[in-house]
UniProtKB/Swiss-Prot annotation:
Any one GO CC term of the record: extracellular region
Predominant localisation class: secreted
Name of the featured protein: Iota-carrageenase
UniProt keyword terms in alphabetical order: Carbohydrate metabolism, Cell wall biogenesis/degradation, Disulfide bond, Glycosidase, Hydrolase, Polysaccharide degradation, Secreted, Signal
Gene source species: Zobellia galactanivorans (strain DSM 12802 / CCUG 47099 / CIP 106680 / NCIMB 13871 / Dsij)
Gene designation: cgiA
Length: 491
């Protein structure tokens, strides 16, 4: 579907109300209001398409480079050669309908891939299981910055099929040090692979070496991992996300937790716009989680959650302290930190750096005390945040099963509904159960350290039982404290 963009006159974006609100059924209508139903923007604010001279230079991967698009051999070297050949003058490279096996495809400046409708892209067979693998790389792991590059489905959507590979560590596109890019028009068939399928990445190079000015749109994904999903944005400026859909996981995860950004003291996201973000049977369509990064403004319109835990999840920024003493256990490190900051100051202890180091997350109420403490073991680390942001036209539909639930969410599900939940088995990752509500916002919304405002307006809430807590805040009382041991296994 092609976006119909309208010109804008104030900055690069305008949000306009058209039409009326839908009928709302909810036990708490205080947050329901008339909201915009479409986010309209000038396409040129995000991406400039190739000019006529570039479009006139066309090559075909099969007829010009001899790729067999019917076998199962690795086609990466020939595709990389074709991209390199076109990069000097710029051009369009067509991948005719067929099957291609690809890995480590290096995108270059002024090269635009047009992949015909119905084409299937597979990761190369026999990839090393323990390593991370990228099909397309927009200057994330390569050295040079690139400009003016795109991958789009031609005539309809192509397919990226991640299923059945020897490696579960699969990334469809890693978008790094690139300006003016577009990724559009395909379907991802997943099987809960590790990583979000599209990473909007920080690169630890000189300057602001991360994505600027781009569009990611018209992509749907099936069977995503709850801990990942379709998109994760670490660092980006002036990006539009449009018409994205995911089954499972998180569709648009604005979680800026790349540790390289913490060391470099730069990165994060600014001027992010999104519209038509949907998730079915997942965790949530939209997630804000700044970790340690100070991020800019995010504007989102038209969010749909069907059978998800929540439609919008907002997490406070936090201080994360690493165990430089390499203690033997999580409890030992927790006791050390709480000996400095006081009982209850550690929210959770977990492993970072590929399981090599204990990390303690400081509880939100202790952020100020930790930041200003005299002990250098805990002081001086500032929790992250977003600038005041907006999510409008949120639609949440209840389903009695299929939602992916974090353990911490279960306290807000009435005890009478616990029979609808099953716990992870040996191969599981998350609890499964009913939709829980519309929003969960763990920020104090007072602009103290790690806290910020995401203003959410809802246009349609359907099917939730009357005793559900639809909008959970940081101080919402828990409604069920039953032991989780009685919940039966999903497997």
């Amino acid at each position: 579907m092609k976006l119909q963009f309208k010109p804008v006159y104030l900055a690069s974006i305008a949000i306009m109300a058209i039409g009326c609100t839908k009928e709302v059924t909810e036990n708490d209508t205080s947050e329901i209001s008339e909201v915009p139903t479409e986010l309209r923007a000038a396409a040129s604010s995000f991406y400039t398409p190739p000019g006529q001279n570039v479009r006139a230079n066309k090559k075909n991967l099969v007829t010009d480079y001899g790729v067999n698009h019917n076998d199962q051999n690795d086609d990466s070297s020939k595709l990389n050669l074709a991209i390199k050949d076109l990069s000097d003058t710029g051009g369009i490279l067509t991948l005719p309908k067929g099957k291609y096996y690809l890995t480590k495809i290096r995108m270059r400046s002024n090269v635009h891939l047009e992949i015909e409708k119905g084409t299937v892209i597979y990761p190369t067979k026999g990839l090393t299981p323990a390593k991370n693998h990228r099909i397309f790389d927009f200057a994330s792991k390569t050295e040079e910055k690139i400009e003016n590059a795109s991958i789009v489905g031609k005539g309809g959507k192509f397919i990226v099929d991640l299923r059945g590979n020897s490696s579960k560590n699969q990334i469809v596109a890693d978008v790094g040090n690139v300006t003016n890019f577009k990724i559009s028009n395909f379907t991802i068939k997943d099987e809960k692979t590790i990583f979000a399928s599209i990473l909007v990445s920080f690169t630890d190079k000189a300057g602001n070496a991360w994505p600027h000015k781009g569009i990611i749109e018209n992509i749907d994904q099936a069977n995503a991992h709850t801990g990942y999903g379709l998109i994760q944005a670490y660092a980006a400026d002036n990006i539009l996300f449009n018409n994205l859909s995911c089954t499972g996981g998180v569709t648009l995860r604005l979680e800026t937790d790349n540790l390289a950004m913490k060391t470099a003291k730069k990165g994060g996201v600014r001027d992010i716009f999104a519209t038509k973000i949907k998730n079915t049977n997942g965790l949530t369509p939209v997630m804000f989680s700044p970790h340690f990064m100070e991020n800019g403004k995010v504007t989102i319109d038209d969010v749909t959650a069907i059978g998800c835990a929540y439609a919008v999840r907002v997490e406070h920024g936090f201080i994360e302290i690493f165990d430089k003493g390499n203690r033997a256990s999580a409890d030992a490190f927790k006791n050390y930190i709480e000996g400095i900051l006081g009982a209850g100051s550690v929210e959770v202890v977990y492993k970072r750096n590929n399981g090599r180091t204990w990390a303690a997350r400081i509880a939100n109420d202790f952020n100020e005390a930790a930041y200003n403490h005299s002990n250098p073991a805990v002081s001086g680390i500032k929790p992250g945040k977003f600038a005041t942001s907006k999510v409008t036209n949120v639609k949440a539909t209840y389903k009695g099963t299929g939602a992916k639930l974090k353990q911490a969410f279960l306290s807000y599900l009435p005890c009478s509904e616990r029979s609808k939940v099953c716990r992870p088995g040996p191969d599981g990752f998350e609890y499964n159960g009913p939709s829980l509500g519309v929003t969960i916002d763990n920020t104090k919304r007072d602009n103290s350290l790690g806290n910020y405002n995401v203003n959410v307006s809802t246009s349609s809430v359907q099917g939730f039982p009357n005793n559900y807590v639809l909008n959970v805040k940081y101080n919402t009382p828990k409604v069920c404290n039953q032991n989780l041991g009685s919940i039966t296994s999903c497997n």
